[in-house]
Amino acid sequence: VSERWPDGTVDWLARRARISPDATALIEAADATEWTYADLDEAVAATAGRLAALGVREGDHLGVLMETRVAFVRLVHAAARLGAVLVPLNARLADPELARQAAVADLTLLVCEAETESAAVAASEPRRADDSRADGEPVGAVPVASVDPPDREPVASLRETEPAAVAPAERSRGDRQALLFTSGTTGDPKAVALTAGNVLSSAVSSAFRLGATPDDRWLLCLSMYHMGGLSVVLRSALYGSTVVLQAGFDAARAADAIAAYDVTGVSLVPTMLRRMLDATDDLADSLRFVLLGGAPAREELLERCEERRVPVHPTYGMTETTSQIATARPREAFAHRGTVGRPLLWTDVTVVDDAGEPVSVGETGELVVAGPTVTPGYYGDPGATEAAFGPRGLHTGDVGYRDDGGRIWVLNRREDRIVTGGENVHPGEVADVLRDHPDVRDAAVVGLDDEEWGERVGALVVPEAGATLSVGDVERHCEGRLAGYKRPRTVGVADELPRTASGTVEREAVREFLRE
């Protein structure tokens, strides 16, 4: 059976196993267990056969509910081999949230682990007659299988299922490869459809920016139900590089793994990198790139990276663009602190005003993205798809600008814009001023309801370790640095900012804190 898809794309793992079967595909950091590409290919063939025996066919939606582990890696490649659509679900969600996502995703089978079995069973239960999936039909029970010995009778054991014969699926670039749910910062999470072409284009453009080679070893310590973690597995098979898998993030263990396994690359959110720098004197010299996304890279963190020669690559991306949109290399990141660099290969970014027209260099507006990494839309939600796209591409909802060097700067979400007394305030601008205070480590700025002005500016600040920071200190710092209407009228101090699993500030939680 040909490994090549009709229009030139390939089964990456099968091809890699044929080209370099003895190359190391995967290392489990906890015990140094290694898999060559031939080993992994054989294991994936068995997993694909077991999924087929449980009824998964080409085009079906395969749900996965587990944290990062070797079994998850096998499921990713097995889904691709079957031509099934991978649907990774966030293992940290509450049962009702999972049930809603399972209904939207129209799953054929949900695969779990021991720790998520109870949640998987709850999410798979038949829904009420007034509850429906994306096509409007009532949702019945979804079969559940576990990669671990199951505790419940309805749950099948994937390991004990006799594999069926599998013929590798022939797929085109326009076929869906995955559905990933957004983090929900704009309301109910939506299922982002990503095609095989999206994934391939993202992998290639990222390789150009990072200089990826088969000799790379990429530490995987992010959750694989987010694109930042999933992309490491998908790309490594294309590059022929090695995944060093750490199940569950621990800052000290991650730093140790980088040194022990000569890791050259790692994907992190800023909080994770900050904790790693706190936990160790120096990161190993083998490290060639630290892809930093999920939240802005603050100046304080960039300063620490420059001082300690950490090759940080601040990146801007989203699920809808299959991860990266723009990425700065270290020299650029240190010289222009706060930028996310230039758009990746094949990616076009246009900054537009409220009417959708392009603005001049240096002017602020919404970032609109076009290119082969951009999703064709949201599964089962044509209304959301239509609303997200315009003549120039995907409207990201992010506010930023392009400088005269072509670099992109991201300020905040468009809907986060505060309108106070008829004046527009961009939270990112205010937060940057707050972070300039020597005793402020981080800050989040939100709009709060105000009877007189419609909204007022609120700020939650995190002091530096050991610093004593008062509300008055913050207010005095803003005088002369911000126009009166931009200054925070409500200020709170906290040890940390509330964040989602992907590192994004939970703005509603900030508002709740400031309202108390």
What are these regions (language model features)?
Residues W5, D22-V56, D60, L65-R69, ...:
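Conserved AMP-binding/adenylate-forming core of the ANL superfamily
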